[in-house]
Amino acid sequence: IYLQGYNQLSMASDDFDPGPWLDEISSLYRKADPAHDFSHILRVCNMARKIGQEEKADMRVLLPAALLHDLGSKKGAGSEQEPSGQAGLGAARAFLQGKGLGRDRIEKVLYAVEVHSFSRGVRPVTLEARILQDADRLDAMGAIGIARLFVTGGALGREMYHLQDPFCREREPDDKRWNLDHFYRKLL
């Protein structure tokens, strides 16, 4: 039902099939803000799988990381609160341990989750973490990215744009105050 437009099998790889986890993971994102909800998770997971197959990534690390990368994001959090903070990492660790994954694999998944965020400004070291970061950033572009931007900005009560300088020609972008500034800070 929640896979509208996505074939569950399209997310599977030869190394890992996330299908059995999807119902449980979807319930973990019920309180997520609209920009980091389960549909975002599915898009990032699919993009990560596509890139990962081309780059020969370890899908047993990449796909669980993609599924759990925004765990802990709450409604209205947006960029005001790091979606994958310590609470999210703790929840991801508990989830993975509950699935019986080994310690080494769990640590690799958690590393990718921890460093994926644009706002952290960290350049990931592992291939899987770099792919997750790229897949997440790709979901911030295009029509979906624009929709996510304005949904989050609206939820946070931000003004749409700076009245005197909407295109940041004579000032630094401040996307904590104006939605349109987010394009200049992150997307352009």
What are these regions (language model features)?
Residues 59-78, 84, 88, 109-119:
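His-Asp-centered metal-binding catalytic motifs of divalent-metal-dependent phosphohydrolases/nucleases
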Residues 44, 84-96:
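An active-site-proximal "capping" alpha-helix that borders the catalytic cofactor pocket
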Residues 12-26:
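Short alpha-helical hairpin
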Residues 12, 29-56, 68, 121-188:
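Divalent metal-dependent phosphate-bond-processing catalytic cores, especially two-metal-ion Mg2+/Mn2+ enzymes
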Residues 95, 102-130:
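Hydrophobic, well-structured mid-protein blocks that either form specific transmembrane helices
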Residues 16, 20, 63-66, 108, ...:
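Generic alpha-helical secondary structure signal
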Residues 29-33, 52, 71-79, 96, ...:
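Short amphipathic alpha-helical interaction patches enriched in hydrophobic/aromatic residues
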